[in-house]
């Protein structure tokens, strides 16, 4: 029964993550396909460059909600059922980590857009908000400062997710926070960094676009 619930959590969380808010907002607001502009991604950064700040903030908020909703859904589905090799708390956290990662995967590879979406940053932070708000807040601050000082959204995103992971190291091994949090942060930050590999190449080559550059 628990395996069936975990499977349900993963499928629903993936579908939640697959909701292409960047595509929907741009198509409804300006009748355009955001994938035909700029980076071709559906995330808030490309929406910012294409449609402006208000649309980008809306998309970012909705993408965050996807992560929060997936983690919350996992908690509701698992309820008080326990894993055979652990406690009830472990069962819930394990399911929530799976849910958060599935939502991030859905955002990156959305079934509704032929598996072509964003890079998963906002949805990752949504999951982190639901799991460990203090790490999410710290990582978000690092993201904003990094992007603001450098002018590169990609650099801010990478440093932000890594910052959340870095804070969880002492929180886990010194303060006793659940290890599931750091598992989510490690896997999520690794996936997001991989999704930014082209940006990293452009950063090293000095060819990465600034945050305020408009898409064409």
Curated annotation (Swiss-Prot):
Bilayer topology term: Multi-pass membrane protein
Catalytic activity: an acyl phosphate + sn-glycerol 3-phosphate = a 1-acyl-sn-glycero-3-phosphate + phosphate
Swiss-Prot/TrEMBL keywords: Cell membrane, Lipid biosynthesis, Lipid metabolism, Membrane, Phospholipid biosynthesis, Phospholipid metabolism, Transferase, Transmembrane, Transmembrane helix
SMART domains per record: G3P_acyltransf (SM01207)
Keyword Transmembrane helix: yes
Keyword Cytoplasm: no
Localization: Cell membrane
GO molecular function: acyl-phosphate glycerol-3-phosphate acyltransferase activity
Membrane-traversing stretches: 6-26, 58-78, 92-112, 125-145, 158-178
Any one of the GO CC terms: plasma membrane
BP-aspect Gene Ontology terms: phospholipid biosynthetic process
Protein family: Belongs to the PlsY family.
Quaternary structure (record): Probably interacts with PlsX.
Record protein name field: Glycerol-3-phosphate acyltransferase 3
UniProt organism field: Dehalococcoides mccartyi (strain ATCC BAA-2266 / KCTC 15142 / 195) (Dehalococcoides ethenogenes (strain 195))
């Amino acid at each position: 029964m628990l395996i069936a619930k975990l499977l349900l959590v993963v499928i629903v969380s993936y579908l939640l993550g697959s909701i292409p808010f960047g595509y929907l907002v741009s198509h409804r607001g300006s009748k355009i396909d955001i994938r035909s502009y700029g980076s071709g991604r559906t995330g808030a950064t490309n929406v910012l460059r294409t449609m402006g700040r208000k649309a980008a903030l809306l998309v970012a908020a909705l993408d965050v909600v996807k992560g929060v909703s997936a983690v919350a859904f996992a908690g509701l589905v698992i309820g008080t059922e326990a894993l055979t090799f652990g406690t009830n708390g472990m069962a819930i956290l394990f399911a929530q980590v799976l849910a958060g990662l599935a939502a991030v995967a859905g955002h990156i590879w959305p079934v509704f857009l032929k598996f072509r979406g964003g890079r998963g940053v906002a949805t990752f932070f949504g999951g982190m908000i639901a799991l460990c708000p203090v790490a999410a807040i710290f990582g978000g601050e690092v993201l904003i400062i990094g992007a603001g000082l450098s002018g590169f959204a990609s650099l801010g995103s990478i440093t932000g997710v890594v910052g959340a992971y870095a804070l969880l190291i002492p929180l886990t091994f010194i303060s006793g926070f659940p290890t599931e949090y750091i598992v989510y942060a490690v896997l999520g930050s690794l996936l997001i960094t991989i999704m930014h590999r082209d940006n990293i190449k452009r950063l090293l080559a000095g060819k990465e676009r600034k945050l305020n550059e408009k898409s064409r």
